[in-house]
């Protein structure tokens, strides 16, 4: 049995498959996911698992070089926005209108659906690399 970190088989497989610049989405329970889109549905009941718990688990295991948020999150869900900023540190953030965000999710390798039930609790994570030429 795995000792720590993410236990979900599908989520582990997804994260291990990501290469540089690949994107994934962590979504609330209301974000529309196209039928043809790969998805990992972690939702159990409204509110569980919460968005931030899933984000924390993914951030612990994935090198992230940039994120995308719906610009509406700043006004419609400022507490969540501040929590995301605190977790992401200096990672560059791109803000786009929610409709554009939904269109961008179609390019992601997968959407991870949480039970989160607050507005605009969605994020696109762009995979980075965990080494640089300075390492050699």
Swiss-Prot record:
Pfam families: RbsD_FucU (PF05025). Keywords: Carbohydrate metabolism, Cytoplasm, Isomerase. Pathway: Carbohydrate metabolism; D-ribose degradation; D-ribose 5-phosphate from beta-D-ribopyranose: step 1/2. GO terms for molecular function: D-ribose pyranase activity; intramolecular lyase activity; monosaccharide binding. InterPro entries: D-ribose_pyranase, RbsD-like_sf, RbsD_FucU. It is found in: Cytoplasm. The keyword Translocase does not apply. The keyword Hydrolase does not apply. The active site is at 20 (proton donor). It is an enzyme of class 5 (isomerase). Its EC number is 5.4.99.62. It comes from the Bacteria. GO terms for biological process: D-ribose catabolic process. It catalyses: beta-D-ribopyranose = beta-D-ribofuranose. GO terms for cellular component: cytosol. Substrate binds at residues 28, 98, 120-122. Homodecamer. NCBIfam families: PRK11797.1. Belongs to the RbsD / FucU family. RbsD subfamily. This is D-ribose pyranase. The gene is rbsD.
């Amino acid at each position: 049995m795995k000792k720590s970190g993410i236990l979900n088989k599908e989520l582990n497989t997804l994260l291990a498959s990501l290469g540089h610049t690949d994107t994934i989405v962590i979504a609330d329970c209301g974000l529309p996911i196209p039928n043809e889109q790969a998805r990992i549905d972690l939702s159990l009941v409204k509110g569980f698992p919460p968005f931030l718990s899933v984000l924390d688990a993914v951030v612990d295991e994935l090198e992230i070089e940039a994120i995308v948020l719906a610009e509406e999150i700043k006004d419609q869900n400022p507490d969540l926005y501040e929590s995301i900023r605190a977790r992401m540190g200096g990672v560059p953030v791109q803000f786009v209108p929610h409709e554009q965000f939904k269109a961008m999710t179609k390019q992601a390798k997968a959407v991870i659906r949480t039970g989160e039930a607050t507005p605009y609790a969605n994020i696109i994570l762009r995979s980075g690399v965990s080494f640089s030429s300075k390492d050699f």
